[in-house]
C-alpha cells in the first residue's frame, strides 16, 4: 500500500494548512483510494504556525487577556498540543503591529510585556516545551517588556524599575535576575526565527524594521543608541554579548532579550515545526510527499515551508511534489533544493480573487491530476 505524506503550508487568505492538506487528500483518494495518507499541516514559524501545530497535534487554542503593545488590554490566543505538553505562541498576538493604530505607532513607547504574560500563562498550564514565533512585532524594546513580565528586574541607577518601551532602555543601570519565575528554566524554550539581523547597527532592529513600526529617522537613531546601551548593560551585568548575535535583532530585539534573559535558542521556523509535528518519523517510509503554499518562486528557497519539507524528505530519499497557487519568476530554483516537480493549481486564466475563492476545489483537482500520473508510474 502506498504511503503518501501531505504536508502543505497555508494558502494565505484562501486555506489553512489543514484545509489544504484535506483538499489534496480528497483529490488523491479519487484515484488512489486505499493509500495510507498522513496529513501534516505545516508552517514556517510565522503567521499560521499556531494553527498548523495545533491541527497537527490535535490540540486546542486558548484565549487570554494580556497587556498590548501600548499597555491596553488585548485578547491573545496561543496553542496547546493535545497532550498539553507543548505551547505554541506567536508574539504578534500580544505585541503585534496590527494591534496598534497607524497614528499611534511609535516603537519608543511599545512594549513586549504581553508576550511575557503569554509565556507565564503557558507555564501555568504545565507545559514542557514552548515554541515562540517572533514575527510581526510593533516593538523595539529589546525584549525588555517580556523580561519584566517573567520576573527580570530592570533597574535604574536609583533601584527603581525602568519604564516600558524602547525609549526607556537608556534608564537601565542594573539587572536583577533573582525574581525570575523558576519554571522558565524547567521548560524547553525554542524561538522560531528566520532573520539574521544583529541587534544594532545598519542591519539592526531599529534601522531595518523601525520605519514600518512608525519610527522617524531621528527615532531610529535614538532607538539604535538605546539598544546599544541595553546590550552593554546586559554584557556588564550578565556576561552575555548579544549586540552582534545573528537573529538578536528579530522582533525589535526580542531575540536578544530571549537569549540574554531566558537562554532561548533561535531556530529556523520550519525546522521547529518539523520537529513539533514529528515529521521525520512520519516521512521516512513514505512513497512520496506532497507539499505546497500560495506561491512558489525564487524566494521560496530562503527558508520557506516547501523547501524545509523537501530537505527533510530527501534525507530518506523520498520524492517531493509541490503544488502552488501560482508559480512565480525563478520558481525552477526549488528543483536544486529537493523538490522534484512543481505545479500550479490554476487551470486557466482567472482573477486572484476567483482563484482564492475556489482554492480548495482547484487544489483538489490539481492533486487528482498528479495522482493519476503517479499511479501510471506504479502500474508500469
Curated annotation (Swiss-Prot):
Keyword Transferase: yes
GO biological process, one term: organic acid phosphorylation
Enzyme class per UniProt: transferase
Gene3D superfamilies registered for this protein in UniProt: Glycerate kinase, domain 1, Glycerate kinase, domain 2
MF-aspect GO terms: ATP binding; glycerate kinase activity
Catalytic activity: (R)-glycerate + ATP = (2R)-3-phosphoglycerate + ADP + H(+)
Sorted UniProt keywords: ATP-binding, Kinase, Nucleotide-binding, Transferase
Domain of life of the native organism: Bacteria
InterPro entries cross-referenced by the UniProt entry: Glyc_kinase_flavodox-like_fold, Glycerate_kinase, Glycerate_kinase_RE-like, Glycerate_kinase_sf
EC number per UniProt: 2.7.1.31
Family of this protein: Belongs to the glycerate kinase type-1 family.
Designated name of the protein: Glycerate kinase
Protein species of origin: Halalkalibacterium halodurans (strain ATCC BAA-125 / DSM 18197 / FERM 7344 / JCM 9153 / C-125) (Bacillus halodurans)
Origin organism lineage: Bacteria, Bacillati, Bacillota, Bacilli, Bacillales
Amino acid at each position: 500500500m502506498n504511503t503518501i505524506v501531505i504536508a502543505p503550508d497555508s494558502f494565505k487568505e484562501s486555506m489553512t494548512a489543514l484545509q489544504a492538506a484535506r483538499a489534496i487528500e480528497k483529490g488523491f483518494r479519487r484515484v488512489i483510494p486505499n493509500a495510507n495518507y498522513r496529513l501534516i499541516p505545516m508552517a514556517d514559524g510565522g503567521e499560521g504556525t499556531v494553527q498548523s501545530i495545533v491541527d497537527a497535534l490535535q490540540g486546542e487554542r486558548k484565549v487570554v487577556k494580556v497587556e498590548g503593545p501600548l499597555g491596553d488590554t488585548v485578547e491573545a490566543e496561543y496553542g496547546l498540543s493535545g497532550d498539553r505538553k507543548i505551547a505554541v505562541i506567536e508574539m504578534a498576538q500580544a505585541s503585534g503591529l496590527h494591534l496598534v493604530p497607524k497614528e499611534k505607532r511609535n516603537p519608543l513607547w511599545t512594549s513586549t510585556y504581553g508576550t511575557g504574560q503569554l509565556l507565564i500563562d503557558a507555564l501555568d498550564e504545565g507545559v514542557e516545551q514552548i515554541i515562540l514565533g517572533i514575527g510581526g512585532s510593533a516593538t523595539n524594546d529589546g525584549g525588555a517588556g517580556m523580561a519584566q513580565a517573567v520576573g527580570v528586574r530592570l533597574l535604574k541607577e536609583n533601584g527603581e524599575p525602568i519604564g516600558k518601551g524602547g525609549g526607556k532602555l537608556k534608564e537601565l543601570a542594573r539587572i536583577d535576575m533573582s525574581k525570575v519565575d523558576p519554571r522558565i528554566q524547567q521548560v524547553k524554550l525554542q524561538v522560531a526565527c528566520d532573520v539574521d539581523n544583529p541587534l544594532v547597527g545598519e542591519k539592526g532592529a531599529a534601522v531595518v524594521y523601525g520605519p514600518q513600526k512608525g519610527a522617524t529617522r531621528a527615532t531610529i537613531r535614538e532607538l539604535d543608541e538605546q539598544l546599544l546601551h541595553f546590550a552593554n548593560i546586559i554584557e556588564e551585568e550578565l556576561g552575555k554579548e548579544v549586540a552582534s548575535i545573528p537573529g538578536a535583532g528579530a522582533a525589535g530585539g526580542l531575540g536578544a532579550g530571549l537569549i540574554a534573559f531566558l537562554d532561548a535558542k533561535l531556530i529556523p521556523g520550519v525546522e521547529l515545526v518539523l520537529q513539533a509535528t514529528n515529521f521525520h518519523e512520519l516521512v521516512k517510509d513514505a512513497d512520496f510527499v506532497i507539499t505546497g503554499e500560495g506561491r512558489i518562486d525564487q524566494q521560496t528557497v530562503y527558508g520557506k515551508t516547501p523547501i524545509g519539507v523537501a530537505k527533510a524528505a530527501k534525507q530518506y530519499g523520498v520524492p517531493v511534489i509541490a503544488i502552488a497557487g501560482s508559480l512565480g519568476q525563478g520558481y525552477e530554483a526549488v528543483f536544486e533544493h529537493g523538490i522534484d516537480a512543481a505545479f500550479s493549481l490554476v487551470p486557466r486564466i482567472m482573477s486572484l480573487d476567483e482563484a482564492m475563492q475556489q482554492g480548495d476545489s482547484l487544489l483538489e483537482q490539481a492533486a487528482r491530476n498528479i495522482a493519476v500520473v503517479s499511479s501510471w508510474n506504479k502500474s508500469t
